[in-house]
Amino acid sequence: MTYLLALDQGTSSSRSIVFDRGGRIRAMAQREFRQLYPQPGWVEHDPMEIWETQLATAREALAQAGLTASDIAAIGITNQRETTLLWERASGRPIANAIVWQDRRTEPLCARWREQGLADAVRDVTGLVIDPYFSASKIAWLLDHVPGARTRAERGELAFGTVDSWLLRQLTGGRVHATDTTNASRTMLFDIDRGAWSEPLLAALDIPRALLPAVQQSASHFGDTEPALLGHAVPVCGIAGDQQAALFGQAGFQAGLAKNTYGTGCFLLMHTGAQRQASTHGLITTAAAQVDSTAPRQYALEGSVFIGGAVVQWLRDGLHAIRGSGEVQALAESVPDAGGVVVVPAFTGLGAPYWRPEASGAIVGLTRGSTVAHIARAALESIAFQSAALLDAMSRDAVAAGGQPVSELRVDGGACVNDLLMQFQADLLGIPVVRPQVIETTALGAACLAGLGCGLYAGTDELAAQWQAERRFLPTMPRERAAERMARWERAVRQTVAP
């Protein structure tokens, strides 16, 4: 049994990937599921669709690999974080649809908590800010809007879980109600210093303790699957939220290692080791994957760009500049540079390190000679500019805490295959940008955690030696020129928030 099965449950689809012991992909299956928008600002998923698509892809991936469940050493789970489910403990029946991390319905409740002066306590205990993004307000909303839910929760009849807990419950036939440290750290209820649920916060936010799952380290034995599901019982030995799993899949095991996931948005995480670092630049302190119960707790700094690869979708669907996303690099490369054009894709405001929700998008520097190719190149460059500003903030936080600035950026996600973007990113940062051989790092991270949890791997040193780069993009732009480009970007950003 030298194969690992990663269940990668995302916001729009469920995927399953079979890895061999060397971290190579043997098979992959994927199924999309419905996005539900019952009211403006609301985003929901059907919990049973999440489960059914995930189980179907697991079976498909095994069949595609020509393997049976008895060939699998362990299962690892990685998941969209913060998305919230409540179900009946006895029957496993969900009492409502899952409220997705993107859902903003609980902003009035979060505003009330801020007015009550809870923001400092939440940041001190959890490392987070009070926001509908995280699970706590979603739990409270369900308790107050599903008839009888709060009373049943207080009696211990209901269970809360993020998506990993829900999948674990289904896989084990209801025997296990648990999560890992990384997912717990995204609920706004978890004390990341103590590694336990915060009783004072639970009381302040009026959330019953009886709802919550047990919390285990990310690489550990969570339980065994029901034999009938896959044809043989398989241990579940690894769980991590998607961004922490991606950092782990990038062999980000030590302080100072950083990764950027280029998806619809961009998610930048830097491992800070056993040191919890507070940010003065609008970043979030969160838990990194925990793999050794005898070692100190591990932490990370996290920041996100709202519009990353989505700017390419805008070029396609909004401007009709390209027919498909794969055309953007060729169009951008048809001109030597952006011709002074700067695109600031603040379509939904600006995230870290700016935190300007009122910002709106802008195209700056247009002249009579500007073409759609210049706009396409500027749009692509905007992904790198935003990531560079974020990494600069992260490095400043690291240095302020006595550490070192980031010296290398590991990249993954769909847009990392764009060589033009990756080279420009390296040029702006002045450090190597490294693309791994396996860019499915979220699933790989879950598989690696499962391999550690079941004893297939001896430790993270073995995994670090196994990680391989596909290409290193080295900076070629003079630093003075890079500074000029960043200064022009910052001037354009200021124009998007000008009164």
From Swiss-Prot:
Inhibited by fructose 1,6-bisphosphate (FBP). InterPro entries: ATPase_NBD (IPR043129), Carb_kinase_FGGY (IPR000577), Carb_kinase_FGGY_CS (IPR018483), FGGY_C (IPR018485), FGGY_N (IPR018484), Glycerol_kin (IPR005999). GO terms for molecular function: ATP binding; glycerol kinase activity. This is Glycerol kinase. The keyword Heme does not apply. Belongs to the FGGY kinase family. The gene is glpK. GO terms for biological process: glycerol catabolic process; glycerol metabolic process; glycerol-3-phosphate metabolic process. It comes from Methylibium petroleiphilum (strain ATCC BAA-1232 / LMG 22953 / PM1). Glycerol binds at R81, E82, Y133, D242, Q243. Sn-glycerol 3-phosphate binds at T11, R81, E82, Y133, D242. It comes from the Bacteria. GO terms for cellular component: cytosol.
